[in-house]
């Protein structure tokens, strides 16, 4: 193992998992199409981290682009309290490598597991979760970035209800110019249940409102204890949205970019909107008002993140001075790169640069800590470290999977809705 100097090998989900020698793997957390995740502990400090092994990075161009995007965005958003923190990265075998390791903040579970567990949640929990999602989203949007895959499974939570947004692999840039936005919906495969209707219906442009729709779906899921628009396929997804929200007005219908989808909606019988109070009779009226504004069918009528933060439902949490924006916008120019080998070099360079950065920071922090320790010794102080209880939810269920379309139900329309803005 001379080629793995300074590292150790563990078996995680029957795969070699190569970690920095400072860490011991303690628990398998999950596996999916993009890799495997485990919990690990720093043997010197006792600090826990989540280590994600991103596998088969260069087997497909789309996977390489997704990995590069995730790495860049996690660095750009590093430091916001409601976005998962990237601690370190590693490429143990850099020669023609096909996997990358990301060391991230360790959280206890995701919001999907909490909802599925049936653990009793109060209105105060709902307010806290939605507020934190919006704070993170405000920061993301201010960098001209759309997350595009907000769902309970991508919201990490601790026992103290601290929430952090993760998984930026599907994120895209946002421009005020609609022409620039129109081309960005290629390969858009976000979870169907949280996908805004304007994506399926191929509106001529898209906005930050697509993420607000997803937050509305999450709020409805919290209120009801289950996914709100749980379509079996894309046609059923659209039908469920129309069933609850009612038939769109003519101005909205005219902006549906897919002729097939527009014809389908126009040929449906008129449907009135079902009041959310009837669907969630025990909910806080302010929660239902916010939900109504988030789940506006027309994106132009949907509430913005900034407006949502000022909504009465969140007044107990809202503090404009403590809801920062990102100091710099994110540069998506790397998206034009199509050569896999060039992306391989870009990922390697990102990892090396970040590793050097965090190690320089760590050395500076260690020096400062040593100086502080010397001062404490000189003052003969002895402050005990508190013993925090490691409580919380223990669910180990897999994250919700997409429900595949059942059969050839309105095949042409289904294909049109699935591809969204690719259909022009």
UniProtKB/Swiss-Prot annotation:
Record keywords, A-Z: ATP-binding, Kinase, Magnesium, Nucleotide-binding, Phosphoprotein, Serine/threonine-protein kinase, Transferase
Pfam families: Pkinase
Ranges for domain Protein kinase: 23-314
Domain of life: Eukaryota
A GO MF label: protein serine kinase activity
Reaction catalyzed: L-seryl-[protein] + ATP = O-phospho-L-seryl-[protein] + ADP + H(+); L-threonyl-[protein] + ATP = O-phospho-L-threonyl-[protein] + ADP + H(+)
Enzyme class (EC, first level): transferase
Stretches the record annotates as Disordered: 375-424
GO cellular component, one term: nucleus
Known regulation of activity: Activated by threonine and tyrosine phosphorylation by the upstreamm MAPKK mkk2.
Induction: Expression is induced by cell wall-disturbing compounds.
Post-translational modification (record): Phosphorylated by the upstreamm MAPKK mkk2. Phosphorylation is induced during asexual development. Phosphorylation is regulated by rlmA.
Keyword Chloroplast in annotation: no
Disulphide connectivity of cysteines: none
Subunit structure: Interacts with flbB, flbC, brlA, and rasB. Interacts with fmqA and fmqC. Interacts with hsp90.
Task of the protein: Mitogen-activated protein kinase; part of cell wall integrity (CWI) signaling pathway composed of pkcA, the bck1-mkk2-mpka MAPK cascade and the downstream rlmA transcription regulator. The CWI signaling pathway regulates cell wall integrity and pyomelanin formation. CWI also controls oxidative stress response, gliotoxin production, iron adaptation and asexual development. Finally, CWI is constitutively required for A.fumigatus to cope with the temperature increase found in the mammalian lung environment, during infection.
The protein's name in its UniProt record: Mitogen-activated protein kinase mpkA
């Amino acid at each position: 193992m001379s080629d793995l100097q300074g590292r150790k090998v563990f078996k995680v989900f029957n795969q070699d998992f190569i970690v920095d020698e400072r860490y011991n793997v303690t628990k398998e957390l999950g596996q999916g199409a993009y890799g495997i995740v485990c919990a690990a502990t720093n043997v010197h400090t006792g600090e826990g981290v989540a280590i994600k092994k991103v596998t088969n990075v260069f087997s497909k161009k789309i996977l390489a682009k997704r990995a590069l995007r995730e790495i860049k965005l996690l660095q750009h958003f590093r430091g916001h309290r409601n976005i998962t923190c990237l601690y370190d990265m590693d490429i143990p075998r850099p020669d023609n490598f096909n996997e990358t390791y990301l060391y991230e903040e360790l959280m206890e579970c995701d919001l999907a597991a909490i909802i599925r567990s049936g653990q009793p949640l109060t209105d105060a929990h709902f307010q806290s979760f939605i507020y934190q999602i919006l704070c993170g989203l405000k920061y993301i949007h201010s960098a001209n970035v759309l997350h595009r895959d907000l769902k309970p499974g991508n919201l990490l939570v601790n026992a103290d209800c601290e929430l952090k947004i993760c998984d930026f692999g599907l994120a895209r840039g946002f421009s005020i110019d609609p022409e620039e936005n129109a081309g960005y919906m290629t390969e858009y495969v976000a979870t169907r249940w949280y996908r805004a209707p304007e994506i399926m219906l191929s509106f001529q442009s898209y906005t930050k409102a697509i993420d607000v729709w997803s937050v509305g779906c999450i709020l409805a899921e919290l209120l009801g204890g289950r996914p709100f628009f749980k379509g079996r396929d894309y046609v059923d997804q659209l039908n469920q949205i129309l069933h609850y929200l009612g038939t769109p007005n003519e101005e909205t219908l005219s902006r549906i970019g897919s002729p097939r989808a527009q014809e389908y909606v126009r040929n449906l019988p008129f449907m009135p909107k079902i009041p959310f109070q009837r669907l969630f009779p025990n909910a806080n009226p302010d929660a239902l008002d916010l939900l109504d504004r988030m789940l506006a069918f027309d994106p132009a009528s949907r509430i913005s993140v900034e407006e949502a933060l000022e909504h009465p439902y969140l007044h107990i949490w809202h503090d404009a001075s403590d809801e920062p924006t990102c100091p710099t916008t994110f540069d998506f120019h790397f998206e034009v790169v199509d050569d896999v080998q060039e992306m391989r070099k870009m990922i390697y360079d990102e990892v090396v640069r970040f590793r050097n950065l965090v190690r320089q920071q760590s050395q500076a922090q260690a020096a400062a800590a040593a100086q502080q320790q010397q001062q404490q010794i000189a003052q003969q102080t002895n402050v005990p470290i508190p013993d925090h209880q490691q409580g919380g939810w223990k669910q180990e269920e897999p994250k919700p999977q997409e429900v595949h379309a059942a059969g050839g139900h309105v095949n042409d329309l289904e294909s049109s809705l699935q591809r969204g803005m690719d259909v022009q």
